[in-house]
Amino acid sequence: MSFTFKQFHIDDQQCGMAVSTDAVLLGAWAELTQSSHILDIGAGSGLLSLMAAQRSPHHTSIIAVEIDNAAAKACQFNIKQSPWSETVQLFHGAIQDFQQRHNNNDEPLFDHIICNPPYFEQGTQAKNSARADARHTNTLSFAELQNVISQLLAPQGTASVILPLQSLASFIQQLNAYGLFVAKQLDIISIEGKVANRSILAIQHNPTTAEPQTLTNPAVETQYHQMTIRDKQGRYSETMIDLCRPFYLKL
């Protein structure tokens, strides 16, 4: 399918994962406005990279990493058709290969890393291999993703990811091993009156892993927030409207 946003267009017909509300929420909520060097892991159609480009200062550089051949072609096409063809650069390959090359070349770390990751560690996989890789941790496990974040994120940087409820605990439990913690967590409720079914995490380096815990260096705490997408009548909430107004045509 094709999706037209206020400032760019996305063709995702060849991608394992189509444009989704999850991705739009992630791209709209992530704190990108002060970032000058952004990494999009598993870029797919390039949606998050282009949302980041729209929200970022003109001097920002963005690297979109995508391993799937068809998705990489779609991503490159969407980038070239956008107003930010000079801002967003595509790396076609595995994030592990990108990390190794990046570290070997002693290139600058990233102020912000954004990722809508494969999140199912178990369960029935789609017959389409591209969709299976996009949904399951076949090519990028939670541990591998967190290791990449720990290696490529600048000391004061933030990584933003979105996960369904069933994957949240497993992901968070592994963060400490890589010197990371959840600074902010946005729990998302699809319809008013329901329970949250996915969360966006703002991940940062854990300062207590580098320095002993003291009165002046207390244990880090997570800030918890919550938003509802639609009310009981199916209308977008004011929070949803405010968040997505810069992107959705009809808001």
Swiss-Prot record:
<dbReference type="Pfam" id="PF05175">
    <property type="entry name" value="MTS"/>
</dbReference>
<dbReference type="InterPro" id="IPR002052">
    <property type="entry name" value="DNA_methylase_N6_adenine_CS"/>
</dbReference>
<dbReference type="InterPro" id="IPR050210">
    <property type="entry name" value="tRNA_Adenine-N(6)_MTase"/>
</dbReference>
<comment type="similarity">
    <text>Belongs to the methyltransferase superfamily. tRNA (adenine-N(6)-)-methyltransferase family.</text>
</comment>
<keyword id="KW-0808">Transferase</keyword>
<dbReference type="InterPro" id="IPR007848">
    <property type="entry name" value="Small_mtfrase_dom"/>
</dbReference>
<dbReference type="GO" id="GO:0016430">
    <property type="term" value="F:tRNA (adenine-N6)-methyltransferase activity"/>
</dbReference>
<dbReference type="InterPro" id="IPR020596">
    <property type="entry name" value="rRNA_Ade_Mease_Trfase_CS"/>
</dbReference>
<keyword id="KW-0949">S-adenosyl-L-methionine</keyword>
<dbReference type="GO" id="GO:0000179">
    <property type="term" value="F:rRNA (adenine-N6,N6-)-dimethyltransferase activity"/>
</dbReference>
<dbReference type="GO" id="GO:0003676">
    <property type="term" value="F:nucleic acid binding"/>
</dbReference>
<keyword id="KW-0819">tRNA processing</keyword>
<dbReference type="InterPro" id="IPR022882">
    <property type="entry name" value="tRNA_adenine-N6_MeTrfase"/>
</dbReference>
<keyword id="KW-0489">Methyltransferase</keyword>
<dbReference type="GO" id="GO:0005737">
    <property type="term" value="C:cytoplasm"/>
</dbReference>
<dbReference type="GO" id="GO:0008033">
    <property type="term" value="P:tRNA processing"/>
</dbReference>
<protein>
    <recommendedName>
        <fullName>tRNA1(Val) (adenine(37)-N6)-methyltransferase</fullName>
        <ecNumber>2.1.1.223</ecNumber>
    </recommendedName>
</protein>
<comment type="function">
    <text>Specifically methylates the adenine in position 37 of tRNA(1)(Val) (anticodon cmo5UAC).</text>
</comment>
<keyword id="KW-0963">Cytoplasm</keyword>
<dbReference type="InterPro" id="IPR029063">
    <property type="entry name" value="SAM-dependent_MTases_sf"/>
</dbReference>
